Amino acid sequence: MKKHLLASLLGASLLLPTAVNAADYVIDTKGAHASIQFSVSHLGYSFVVGRFNEFDGKFSFDAAKVSDGKVEVNINTNSVDSNHAERDKHLRSDDFLNTAKFPAAKFVSTSVADKGNGDLWITGDLSLNGVTKPVTIKAHTVGEGQDPWGGYRAGFVGSTEFTMKDFGIKMDLGPASANVKLDLVVEGIKQ
């Protein structure tokens, strides 16, 4: 009798709806399947472009319940690379990133909004140069699925823009150069 009761309860539990949780991913920086690039107008005539070579992060994502998503990214600001050694030294100085005092930047999401057609708005707190302010990353889902090595991956692209002075960056190159645009490519490996 006890065996039948246990079997019935176990069978009934399989019929109950199960909660679907967002999957956890680690950003694939080891395989170089992610990047954080920046661009700043150079006096209104051209653009200075560069990237951060060292960062890591994680995110949670469920396409059926996007609003449950979470993102966290840590950036080694000493890894700034604009392909020009003297400029990179200046970018690390207290005129810009002040890496001696603030060697890391961090983004932590506070909300993720589904805008339809794979578009997401990821709002969160960006900590840079000792200042934390909200920013919104306008992102797009590239795709997700099995990889050839037996894992599962999800990929996104996104961008955001902010004013340097909002983050205590002292250098003033004029109004044409006041903003920084960040372009992000993220591929995560499901954990």
Curated annotation (Swiss-Prot):
Keyword Repressor appears in the UniProt entry: no
Membrane-spanning residues: none
InterPro entries per record: Lipid/polyisoprenoid-bd_YceI (IPR007372), TTHA0802/YceI-like_sf (IPR036761), UPF0312/YceI (IPR023480)
A single cellular component GO annotation: periplasmic space
Residues in the signal sequence: 1-22
Keyword Signal: yes
Pfam annotation, one family: YceI
Top-level lineage group: Bacteria
Subcellular location: Periplasm
Keywords, ordered alphabetically: Periplasm, Signal
PANTHER family to which the protein is assigned, alphabetical: PROTEIN YCEI (PTHR34406:SF1)
Family affiliation: Belongs to the UPF0312 family. Type 1 subfamily.
Annotated protein name in UniProt: UPF0312 protein Sden_2128
Organism of provenance: Shewanella denitrificans (strain OS217 / ATCC BAA-1090 / DSM 15013)
